[in-house]
Amino acid sequence: MSPHVDMSSGSPDGAAPAVQKAFNGFLTENIDESQFPALENRSHLRYTPQDELHDMICVGFGPASLAIGVALHDALDGTDGSLADVQGLQSRPPKVAFLEKQPQFAWHAGMLLPGAKMQITFMKDMATMRNPRSEFTFLNYLHQKDRLVEFANLNTFLPARVEYEDYMKWCASWFEEVVAYSQEVVKVMPEKSASGEITSFNVMSHNHLTGRTESRRAKHVVIAAGGRPNIPAPFPTNHPRVIHSSQFSYMSKQLLKDHDAPYNIAVVGNGQSAAEIFDFLHANYPNSRTRLLIKGGALRPSDDSPFVNEIFNPSRTDCTYNRAPKLRATTLVEDKGTNYGVVRLGLLEHIYETLYMQRIRYGNSPAEEAHWPHRILPYRRVMDVTESPVCQGGVRLHVQDSSALYFSEQAGGQERKETLDVDAVFVATGYLRDLHETLLKDARHLMPGGELEGAKWQVQRDYRVNFTEKSVGEDAGVWLQGCCESTHGLSDTLLSVLATRGGEMVRSLFEKPAKWDNGHVLGGYEVRE
């Protein structure tokens, strides 16, 4: 770290007392709680001054970290009997912090389109599958919002996506005291003790509100930073008219302000997000020409049948992790048809119906189809992206069209090249989940085989990172969330297992009694030297 980096502690004046009472009623006496607003809903977790050693710091405060916070709350209030024996939670409330780069809690806010539904049952919320008695169930949220009866009248397990985000915001509001927003973590650095063993980690973050770099120390660090938008080559990553699907709701309002204008728009991708964007554009920009470019021959339905859904059972995580690596890789490829590059059947049928109506209005022949305002173009690959000489400020897509190889009614179909000039292109090509590799760069010397090019961090079944033997103390470590699909299965990046996994994480993180910096735990009182 540069010696000129501005450090901001953000902690209250005055040191903590030498002796603190042990855990009693979820409060610590050395914290002035008058600095926090009175909250209608408040978790059992309390603010820890920034300069104190934390038991846990979570990098990111999305659904994965939220599930950990919910499980901690349930463990402390006694409603979750499965966590009643966690030793590290017996003497005092844990000292935790969640660092989130966004200014407030948000979940896929850029894809909260009108009418969009969840793709999993509301019962797979932040708590129900682990602790149905929790205050954080979706049903309790509905009860608190006075909508339980009306929701029951909908006769559905699939709430609107906008309502489910509001549910998660409601859950997140309980933890305002321990969440620092606008904090973008930039590195996690190991710290050695006098014995040479790593006993804590320094979490460095950039405060977007102050512009300063801040530092916090923790024994346990959970990296749950989520995915970053994947804009693959040849698309430029910083062009104002090349927009990732995660920003669609925001950017479409800026780029496509006139709903009656004759825009030229392209959507790239063959999954749920691409289909939703294509359908939204068709419905809201009727005078535009919209093209959905897919690499295969057709949009394919997701498989959410009961037997296939067992892939996402929490117990399947054990099965997946314990498989031989080659078998695990094979089954992951088989399972991806349930979630990757597929679309819910109801939306597929709706899109097909809207395209069919164009056959009635504009004609059914191939020549007439070429002039439809909204089309799906199969077997297309974008080979290059340049500035458009036709659409002001837009881009030209240089496309390889392989459809003749598959759809030609005569032998000898040939690939051809085509160009599409568009005012905007929306790229629905998923996410990359590799931020932990960057954050842990200063710990790479602790990675087994870390000197080898291309070596990746490996985790145990409880998501704990494998470090070189005896390099990191038993009471310290790093855990990964949402980037372990190759070892823990397809559900790793999904909502399906969050409630159960949150409980597993609490047990793994706090199984042992917490200690102060000197390592002492003394009866009902914890002593610092």
Curated annotation (Swiss-Prot):
Keywords: FAD, Flavoprotein, Monooxygenase, NADP, Oxidoreductase
Pathway: Siderophore biosynthesis
Cofactor: FAD
Matches recorded under InterPro entries: FAD/NAD-bd_sf, Lys/Orn_oxygenase
Cofactor: record remark: Binds 1 FAD per subunit.
This enzyme's EC code(s): 1.14.13.196
Record's keyword annotation contains ATP-binding: no
UniProt-listed Gene3D superfamilies: FAD/NAD(P)-binding domain (3.50.50.60)
Induction data: Expression is repressed by the transcription repressor SRE1 under iron replete conditions.
Gene Ontology MF: a single term: ornithine N5-monooxygenase activity
Function comment: L-ornithine N(5)-monooxygenase; part of the gene cluster that mediates the biosynthesis of hydroxamate-containing siderophores that play a critical role in virulence. Cochliobolus heterostrophus produces extracellular coprogen-type siderophores including coprogen, neocoprogen I and neocoprogen II, as well as the intracellular siderophore ferricrocin. The role of extracellular siderophores is to supply iron to their producers in planta and the intracellular ferricrocin is required for intracellular iron distribution and storage with a crucial role in ascus and ascospore development.
Assembly behavior: Homotetramer.
Family, per entry: Belongs to the lysine N(6)-hydroxylase/L-ornithine N(5)-oxygenase family.
Protein's name in the database: L-ornithine N(5)-monooxygenase
The species this protein was found in: Cochliobolus heterostrophus (strain C4 / ATCC 48331 / race T)
